[in-house]
């Protein structure tokens, strides 16, 4: 059954969310999502769309509705292949890809490195999010990981990325400062992203 967009919005933890359907299998109008997003854009500082990694109607609809894109990948060849196709499609459609987010890092020695991924996709990595068993628990309790385990490495990296998009300063530990870990490649990329973000999205 169809409902009004406003009626589908659910609010919790200071965020408005429109949940997706698990069983929706009807043909999509690629431009309809863009029209819907445009109708609510002015109410929010940011509207974030989470799409399927597969190149289907949902992904294309999301790409066309977005002003700026981030490609999420895991550090393995099968997923990277899908991410490469998604990045190429976005560029073909004239949508800028601001960065790569590497998710679920488990064993760095046996996974693709940041350098490998950047070289393959030609896009800077802006976040390296470690795998965390607490993410499963947070999902089960329906509490965001950044609230469920605020001090976990996963939560800290997500907050660091958020800081670059909201023009805030990242929080660094004393150990990171003492041992020069503040100059990680992904952090440098986030600083560059912060400088360019408002020029590309919020330009006059």
Name each region found by the language model.
Residues 1-42, 139-141:
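P-loop/Walker-type NTP enzyme "switch/lid" segment
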Residues 35, 39-42, 46, 51-131, ...:
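Conserved catalytic-core segment of NTP-binding enzymes
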Residues 23, 57, 145:
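Short, flexible micro-motifs
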Residues 33-37, 83, 157, 161, ...:
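Generic hydrophobic alpha-helical segments
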Residues 11, 43-46, 158-164:
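Broad hydrophobic/π-residue packing in well-ordered secondary structure
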Residues 29, 33, 79, 154:
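Short, conserved glycine- and acidic-residue-centered signature motifs
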Residues 92-204:
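C-terminal lobe/tail of nucleotide-utilizing enzymes
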């Amino acid at each position: 059954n169809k409902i009004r967009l406003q009626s589908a919005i659910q609010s919790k933890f200071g965020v408005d969310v429109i949940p997706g359907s698990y069983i929706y299998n009807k043909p999509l109008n690629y431009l309809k999502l863009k029209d819907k997003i445009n109708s609510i854009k002015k109410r929010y500082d940011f509207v974030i769309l989470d799409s399927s990694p597969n190149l289907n109607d949902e992904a294309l609809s999301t790409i066309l509705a977005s002003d700026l894109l981030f490609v999420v990948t895991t550090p393995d060849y099968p997923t990277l292949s899908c991410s490469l196709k998604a990045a190429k499609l976005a560029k073909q459609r004239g949508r800028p890809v601001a960065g790569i987010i590497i998710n679920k890092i488990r064993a760095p020695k046996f996974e693709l490195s940041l350098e490998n991924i950047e070289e393959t996709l030609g896009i800077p990595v802006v976040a390296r999010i470690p795998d965390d068993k607490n993410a499963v628990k947070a999902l089960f309790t329906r509490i965001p990981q950044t609230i469920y385990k605020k001090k976990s490495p996963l939560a800290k990296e997500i907050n660091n990325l958020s800081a670059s998009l909201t023009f805030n300063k990242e929080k660094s530990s004393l150990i990171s400062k003492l041992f020069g870990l503040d100059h990680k490649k992904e952090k440098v990329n986030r600083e560059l992203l912060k400088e360019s973000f408002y020029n590309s999205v919020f330009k006059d």
